[in-house]
Amino acid sequence: VASLEAFLRGRLCTAGATAAALTAAAHTLAACARRPWPLLDAEADARTASPAQRDAARTQGRLLLRVARRVWPSPVLDELAGAVPSPHHPLALGAAAHAAGATSEEAALAAAYHAVAGPATAAVRLLGLDPVDVHGVLAGLAPDLAAAARTPHPADWAALPAGAAPALDLLAEAHARAQTRMFVS
């Protein structure tokens, strides 16, 4: 469990911080009169080195956007779907959070949590770790998750974080080509 905690902390500082910032940017963009969704989506592309990770993020974003449009009908969500039919997950999450009435910080917190909860769940399933121990690790990350959500997010999208984990990118590419696939993300 100690190595899982170290992994999750590293993930939160890289992919989690990037996803939180992109989600907050999407939430902010959703409140604007002019919404250049394709430009923000390109920023997400630029921060996701692995094509397999980009495909997974777009699949998750498309599916989330589909559900969000039914649960929280909104012109903003319709506009995002028209501009970017398969947006990166953080864009869909930020826009959906806006449509649901959540704050930018709440949206960023959801993105940060998503970045660590998925791998934590996979560790329980694939490594046979005790779920109570793993959830204890997640609970211990709460202050760091809150800090990631509170981090000021620059208005200049080029200045958004771009934390990377090259080893995970390589694993994602190998997994995408594997005959037996366990997860998409």
Predicted regions mapped to residue ranges:
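Glycine/small-residue-rich interface belts in oligomeric ring/scaffold proteins
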Residues: 1-35
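Electropositive phosphate-/nucleotide-binding environments in soluble metabolic enzymes
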Residues: 17, 51-54, 58, 87, ...
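Internal, conserved structured core segments that host functional sites
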Residues: 20-25, 32-101
